């Protein structure tokens, strides 16, 4: 469900969503004749974007994801470091996966709206590591700076002498408007 934040940010930044965008959740969403359920049976009623984040409403994000589009969701997710190794330097780090909506190999079905629906709640082809999600959420909290994660701050001798110390290392800035970060942070509280 934390991936829903990427959909919200992508929607706000692209103009596909506003804080006042409302969708109704009766507990399910139909795309054609395929039913996608919410986690809450009976639904959440009508919610704006903040309410959808607070309640983690699947039905809201199914519809928001279709409006935002898969390309924008993936673009914003990559900007936050999803789909790449976090850079811990501990060997075999998980890269994770983000969907590639480009046409698939011959004989395989192409990308569908149903794929976009399930991606919008972080399922389907979305694979992330806990460290990637920590990097993403810390960037939201600090206004968009992606820092290289560390698991060790300082190495000290038994005597207490500092042998090595690691300072925060900014990797890049996520190009998101301050008001978008402020809105998302407030909704997360």
Predicted regions and their residues:
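Beta-lactam-recognizing serine transpeptidase/beta-lactamase-like catalytic domain environment
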Residues: 1, 6-189
